[in-house]
Amino acid sequence: LTIAYGQRHVIEVERARQVAAALGASKHTIISLDLRTIGGSALTSEFEVPKDRISSGQRQGIPITYVPGRNLIFLSLAAAHAEVLGASLIYFGANVLDYSGYPDCRPEFLQAFEQAVMKGTKAGVEGKPLHIRAPLLEMTKADIIRKGLQLGAPLHLTHSCYDPIGTLACGRCD
Protein backbone atom coordinates (compact mmCIF):
# COMPACT_ATOMS: atom_id res chain seq x y z
CA LEU A 1 0.00 0.00 0.00
CA THR A 2 1.38 3.38 -1.01
CA ILE A 3 -0.24 6.69 -0.25
CA ALA A 4 0.26 9.66 -2.55
CA TYR A 5 -0.64 12.52 -0.24
CA GLY A 6 0.41 15.58 -2.20
CA GLN A 7 3.98 15.40 -0.96
CA ARG A 8 6.58 17.48 -2.75
CA HIS A 9 8.77 14.39 -3.06
CA VAL A 10 6.43 12.53 -5.45
CA ILE A 11 9.37 10.40 -6.64
CA GLU A 12 8.62 8.40 -3.48
CA VAL A 13 5.41 7.05 -5.04
CA GLU A 14 7.11 5.97 -8.27
CA ARG A 15 9.91 4.30 -6.32
CA ALA A 16 7.36 2.43 -4.18
CA ARG A 17 5.78 1.17 -7.40
CA GLN A 18 9.20 -0.01 -8.61
CA VAL A 19 10.01 -1.73 -5.30
CA ALA A 20 6.64 -3.53 -5.29
CA ALA A 21 7.28 -4.76 -8.84
CA ALA A 22 10.84 -5.84 -8.03
CA LEU A 23 9.62 -7.82 -5.02
CA GLY A 24 6.83 -9.44 -7.05
CA ALA A 25 3.98 -8.01 -5.00
CA SER A 26 0.75 -9.67 -6.08
CA LYS A 27 -1.08 -6.39 -5.56
CA HIS A 28 0.17 -2.85 -5.03
CA THR A 29 -2.53 -0.37 -4.17
CA ILE A 30 -1.89 3.37 -4.45
CA ILE A 31 -4.32 5.60 -2.60
CA SER A 32 -4.38 9.27 -3.55
CA LEU A 33 -5.39 12.00 -1.15
CA ASP A 34 -4.32 15.59 -0.98
CA LEU A 35 -2.98 16.71 2.38
CA ARG A 36 -1.90 19.98 0.74
CA THR A 37 -5.44 21.19 1.43
CA ILE A 38 -4.65 20.94 5.14
CA GLY A 39 -1.11 22.33 4.79
CA GLY A 40 1.04 23.03 7.81
CA SER A 41 4.13 21.13 6.66
CA ALA A 42 7.20 21.68 4.52
CA LEU A 43 6.33 18.40 2.79
CA THR A 44 2.92 19.59 1.58
CA SER A 45 3.23 23.39 1.56
CA GLU A 46 5.65 26.03 0.37
CA PHE A 47 7.65 26.08 3.62
CA GLU A 48 11.35 25.42 3.16
CA VAL A 49 12.63 21.93 4.04
CA PRO A 50 15.29 22.26 6.78
CA LYS A 51 18.78 21.29 5.67
CA ASP A 52 22.07 20.44 7.35
CA ARG A 53 20.63 19.82 10.84
CA ILE A 54 23.30 17.33 11.90
CA SER A 55 23.21 17.37 15.69
CA SER A 56 20.16 16.53 17.74
CA GLY A 57 20.82 19.77 19.62
CA GLN A 58 19.64 21.63 16.53
CA ARG A 59 16.32 19.77 16.67
CA GLN A 60 13.93 21.30 19.12
CA GLY A 61 10.21 20.78 19.10
CA ILE A 62 8.23 19.24 16.30
CA PRO A 63 9.87 20.09 12.96
CA ILE A 64 8.19 21.82 10.01
CA THR A 65 8.45 18.51 8.09
CA TYR A 66 5.81 16.98 10.37
CA VAL A 67 2.62 16.50 8.34
CA PRO A 68 -0.36 16.95 10.69
CA GLY A 69 -2.08 13.61 11.19
CA ARG A 70 -0.20 11.89 8.35
CA ASN A 71 0.61 8.61 10.06
CA LEU A 72 -2.76 8.55 11.80
CA ILE A 73 -4.42 8.87 8.38
CA PHE A 74 -2.02 6.41 6.71
CA LEU A 75 -2.50 3.76 9.38
CA SER A 76 -6.27 4.25 9.29
CA LEU A 77 -6.25 3.63 5.54
CA ALA A 78 -3.93 0.65 6.02
CA ALA A 79 -6.25 -0.79 8.68
CA ALA A 80 -9.28 -0.39 6.40
CA HIS A 81 -7.37 -2.00 3.52
CA ALA A 82 -6.10 -4.84 5.72
CA GLU A 83 -9.61 -5.48 7.00
CA VAL A 84 -10.96 -5.77 3.44
CA LEU A 85 -8.12 -8.14 2.51
CA GLY A 86 -8.60 -10.22 5.65
CA ALA A 87 -5.04 -9.45 6.75
CA SER A 88 -4.04 -9.54 10.40
CA LEU A 89 -0.78 -7.57 10.23
CA ILE A 90 0.08 -4.07 9.12
CA TYR A 91 3.78 -3.33 8.63
CA PHE A 92 4.74 0.29 9.17
CA GLY A 93 8.16 1.82 8.46
CA ALA A 94 8.32 4.26 11.39
CA ASN A 95 11.67 4.85 13.02
CA VAL A 96 12.13 6.37 16.47
CA LEU A 97 15.91 6.20 17.08
CA ASP A 98 16.70 8.69 14.35
CA TYR A 99 13.67 10.51 15.74
CA SER A 100 12.80 13.66 13.86
CA GLY A 101 10.38 14.79 16.55
CA TYR A 102 7.25 13.38 14.94
CA PRO A 103 4.67 12.44 17.59
CA ASP A 104 3.17 9.78 15.31
CA CYS A 105 6.42 7.79 15.08
CA ARG A 106 6.57 6.89 18.76
CA PRO A 107 5.90 3.44 20.25
CA GLU A 108 3.10 4.82 22.44
CA PHE A 109 1.31 6.19 19.38
CA LEU A 110 1.50 2.81 17.65
CA GLN A 111 0.22 1.01 20.75
CA ALA A 112 -2.69 3.45 21.10
CA PHE A 113 -3.52 3.16 17.41
CA GLU A 114 -3.56 -0.63 17.59
CA GLN A 115 -5.99 -0.41 20.52
CA ALA A 116 -8.22 1.97 18.55
CA VAL A 117 -8.25 -0.47 15.63
CA MET A 118 -9.20 -3.30 18.00
CA LYS A 119 -12.21 -1.31 19.19
CA GLY A 120 -13.14 0.51 15.99
CA THR A 121 -13.10 -2.11 13.25
CA LYS A 122 -15.33 -5.02 12.38
CA ALA A 123 -12.29 -7.31 12.47
CA GLY A 124 -11.34 -6.17 15.97
CA VAL A 125 -14.86 -6.41 17.36
CA GLU A 126 -15.27 -9.89 15.85
CA GLY A 127 -12.07 -11.12 17.51
CA LYS A 128 -9.86 -10.93 14.40
CA PRO A 129 -7.50 -8.20 15.54
CA LEU A 130 -5.22 -6.22 13.25
CA HIS A 131 -1.74 -5.82 14.68
CA ILE A 132 0.74 -3.08 13.83
CA ARG A 133 4.35 -4.15 13.30
CA ALA A 134 7.10 -1.55 13.05
CA PRO A 135 10.30 -3.59 12.59
CA LEU A 136 12.44 -0.51 11.90
CA LEU A 137 11.28 1.36 14.98
CA GLU A 138 14.35 0.75 17.17
CA MET A 139 16.94 0.60 14.37
CA THR A 140 19.36 3.33 13.36
CA LYS A 141 19.36 4.36 9.71
CA ALA A 142 22.70 2.56 9.30
CA ASP A 143 21.18 -0.61 10.80
CA ILE A 144 18.23 -0.33 8.42
CA ILE A 145 20.59 -0.20 5.44
CA ARG A 146 22.62 -3.15 6.77
CA LYS A 147 19.43 -5.19 7.25
CA GLY A 148 18.25 -4.28 3.76
CA LEU A 149 21.55 -5.44 2.28
CA GLN A 150 21.42 -8.65 4.33
CA LEU A 151 17.89 -9.36 3.05
CA GLY A 152 18.75 -8.49 -0.56
CA ALA A 153 16.25 -5.63 -0.62
CA PRO A 154 16.29 -3.52 -3.81
CA LEU A 155 17.77 -0.50 -2.02
CA HIS A 156 18.80 1.01 -5.35
CA LEU A 157 15.09 1.54 -6.05
CA THR A 158 14.30 3.24 -2.75
CA HIS A 159 14.09 6.97 -2.13
CA SER A 160 14.43 8.74 1.20
CA CYS A 161 14.63 12.49 0.67
CA TYR A 162 12.18 15.27 1.47
CA ASP A 163 13.56 17.73 -1.07
CA PRO A 164 14.96 15.82 -4.04
CA ILE A 165 16.72 17.35 -6.98
CA GLY A 166 14.90 15.55 -9.78
CA THR A 167 15.31 11.87 -8.96
CA LEU A 168 18.38 12.41 -6.76
CA ALA A 169 18.43 12.88 -3.00
CA CYS A 170 19.55 16.32 -1.85
CA GLY A 171 21.86 14.76 0.76
CA ARG A 172 21.10 17.53 3.25
CA CYS A 173 17.58 17.09 4.65
CA ASP A 174 16.52 15.10 7.71
Q: Predicted regions: what is each one?
A:
Residues 1-152:
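ATP-dependent adenylation/nucleotidyltransferase module used to activate substrates
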Residues 155-157:
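Short hydrophobic/aromatic-enriched beta-strand-loop microsegments
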